[in-house]
């Protein structure tokens, strides 16, 4: 008997990953530890303006990394102003150089892109700068930027394609507007800017653009920071407004026209009210769209292998083990239905998936109590449930909210932003006042939130917070002295850093 004819054809790879972002790269490197043959396909479709970038995905190239660096540029401007009150004779004529900042940011990103390629090579992961598209069971077509096609087969596939910014679908949006994909490498200062949207991307970009001295307006359709705690969102909006950012509420653009070409040029934006027939128009140098993001799942041949997606959102439903309805195809990151769109979540999910597939692990990604930070001028860190979600889940009578304003010591000398920083914990009364939501608005909110996130994972209660001795004088100590409940209506204003 000739057994060789009955053996299935071997696959080219054990695992092919579509998408070279944070999640895909984490999964690739982890799978390679188990001596698996792994390939990563990554391709950046240029923006309407032609912007493209290297390996690493959104976070590294057009997301968290450049955003935090530009946020830092804005904070340094504030620090320069504060420094005069501390005895530094800073000349009044300090100016910001956009080109110098973007060059420095892009140089750093370039070094990260190179580092990822080196890491893949060292781990013997095959990387191709090519667009992946399923063509049949266990088979994928890879098309490079010259249009050359190759077919590869694999035992398993991981979809980690991420999301891209959404456009409005109005006259002039793709011709004249930019998105966050373009902003961080924009070769000229954007000048007077209209930011369209109320997402965290919109508010973060508006914040640092205003922080480096630009005239910024934010056009909002309805509420700020949908999905986040609305009490915190409104406090962020108020602070931004007090610091010179203008808000146009309940309006949406219906047309963008070019008045004059240039770098930047001049644009006319016509907008319509969401609750009447009123239209308004304004003139800006740059229009930045930040109205949301869409999953990159519709043009990768999922219909050729039977992977189900949510037709409305493009998101992929998966099991607790990130498995799609097709057993050999998995998905992680921003494209998952009902999961958090955060880089560290994708990284964790990618690593754990590889460990389950190849290392005998049974540990699944925990999507509960994930900390996050919005890097607005006044940073907002949170972990767990918003106040609204807690009330919805446990009932208003079973939720106790402890809160307080606070004033960072460093801000008392320049006498700025008194009673703007705010701390809040949301507790479940029925469960020994377990802390189910943690919220802080203030400097270094991400650094503050990270440690408390570990405590929430361990089942932190209000009693445990109260019995913790604070570090003095720091912002985070406010969480060890919260005594006023929201329902009491008691005074939460602070007169100094020591309460």
From Swiss-Prot:
GO molecular function, one term: NADPH peroxidase activity
Modified-residue entries (N6-succinyllysine), positions: 68
UniProt-listed Enzyme Commission number(s): 1.8.1.9, 1.11.1.2
Cofactor: FAD
Keyword vocabulary terms for this entry: Cytoplasm, Disulfide bond, FAD, Flavoprotein, NADP, Oxidoreductase, Phosphoprotein, Redox-active center, Selenocysteine, Ubl conjugation
UniProt record, GO biological process: cell population proliferation; cell redox homeostasis; mesoderm formation; response to oxidative stress
Binding site for NADP(+): 166, 198-204, 221-222, 226-228, 292-293, 315, 341
Cofactor, free-text remark: Binds 1 FAD per subunit.
Role summary: Reduces disulfideprotein thioredoxin (Trx) to its dithiol-containing form. Homodimeric flavoprotein involved in the regulation of cellular redox reactions, growth and differentiation. Contains a selenocysteine residue at the C-terminal active site that is essential for catalysis. Also has reductase activity on hydrogen peroxide (H2O2).
Residues at which FAD binds: 22-23, 42-43, 58-59, 63-67, 131-132, 161, 200, 334, 341-343, 472
Catalytic activities: [thioredoxin]-dithiol + NADP(+) = [thioredoxin]-disulfide + NADPH + H(+); H2O2 + NADPH + H(+) = NADP(+) + 2 H2O
Residue location of crosslink Cysteinyl-selenocysteine (Cys-Sec): 497-498
GO cellular component: cytoplasm; cytosol; fibrillar center; mitochondrion; nucleoplasm
Modified residues (Phosphotyrosine): 131
Organism: Bos taurus
Post-translational modification: ISGylated.
Subunit structure: Homodimer.
Gene3D superfamilies associated with the record: 3.30.390.30, FAD/NAD(P)-binding domain
Protein name: Thioredoxin reductase 1, cytoplasmic
First-listed, main subcellular location of the protein, grouped into a coarse class: cytoplasm
Subcellular location: Cytoplasm
Catalytic site positions: 472 (proton acceptor)
Miscellaneous comment as given in the Swiss-Prot or TrEMBL entry: The thioredoxin reductase active site is a redox-active disulfide bond. The selenocysteine residue is also essential for catalytic activity.
Pfam families named among the record's database cross-references: Pyr_redox_2, Pyr_redox_dim
């Amino acid at each position: 008997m000739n057994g060789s004819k009955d053996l299935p054809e071997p696959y080219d790879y054990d695992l092919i990953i579509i998408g070279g972002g944070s999640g895909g790269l984490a999964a690739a490197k982890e799978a390679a530890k188990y001596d698996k043959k792994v390939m990563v396909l990554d391709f950046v479709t240029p923006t309407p303006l032609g912007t493209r970038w290297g390996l690493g995905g959104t976070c590294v190239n057009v997301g968290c990394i450049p955003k935090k660096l530009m946020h830092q540029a804005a904070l340094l401007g504030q620090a320069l102003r504060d420094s005069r009150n501390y005895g530094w004779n800073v000349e009044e004529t300090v100016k910001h150089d956009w080109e110098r900042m973007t060059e420095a940011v892009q140089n750093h990103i370039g070094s990260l892109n190179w580092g990822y390629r080196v890491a893949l090579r060292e781990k013997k992961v095959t990387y191709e700068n090519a667009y992946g598209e399923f063509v049949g069971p266990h088979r994928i077509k890879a098309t490079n930027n010259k249009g050359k096609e190759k077919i590869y087969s694999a035992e398993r596939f991981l979809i980690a394609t991420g999301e891209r910014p959404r456009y409005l679908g109005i006259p002039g949006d793709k011709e004249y507007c930019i998105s966050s994909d373009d902003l961080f490498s924009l070769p000229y200062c954007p000048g007077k800017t209209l930011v369209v949207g109320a997402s965290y991307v919109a508010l973060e970009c508006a914040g640092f653009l205003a922080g480096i001295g630009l005239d910024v307006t934010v056009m909002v359709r309805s509420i700020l920071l949908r999905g986040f705690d609305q009490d915190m969102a409104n406090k962020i909006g108020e602070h931004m407004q007090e610091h010179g950012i203008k808000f146009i509420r309940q309006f949406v653009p219906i047309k963008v026209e070019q008045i004059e070409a240039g770098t930047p040029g001049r644009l006319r934006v016509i907008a319509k009210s969401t609750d009447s027939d009123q239209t308004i128009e304004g003139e800006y140098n740059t229009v930045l769209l930040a109205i949301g993001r869409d999953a990159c799942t519709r043009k990768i041949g999922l219909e050729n292998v039977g992977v189900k997606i949510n037709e409305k959102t493009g998101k992929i439903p998966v099991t607790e083990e990130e498995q799609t309805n097709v057993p050999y195809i998995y998905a992680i990151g921003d494209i998952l239905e009902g999961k958090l769109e955060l880089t560290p979540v994708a990284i964790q999910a990618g690593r754990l998936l590889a460990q389950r597939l190849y290392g005998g692990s049974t540990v699944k990604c925990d999507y509960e109590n994930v900390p996050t930070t919005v890097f607005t001028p006044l940073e907002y860190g949170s972990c767990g449930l918003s106040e609204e979600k807690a009330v919805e889940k446990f009932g208003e009578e079973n939720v106790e909210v402890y809160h307080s304003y606070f004033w960072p010591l460093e801000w008392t000398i320049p006498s700025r932003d008194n009673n703007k920083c705010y701390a809040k914990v949301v507790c479940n009364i029925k469960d020994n006042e377990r802390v189910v939501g943690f919220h802080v608005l203030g400097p270094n909110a991400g650094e503050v939130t990270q440690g408390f996130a570990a405590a929430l994972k361990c089942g932190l209660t209000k009693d445990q917070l109260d019995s913790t001795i604070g570090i003095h004088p720091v912002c985070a100590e406010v969480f060890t002295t919260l005594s006023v409940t929201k329902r009491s209506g008691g005074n939460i204003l602070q007169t100094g850093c020591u309460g």
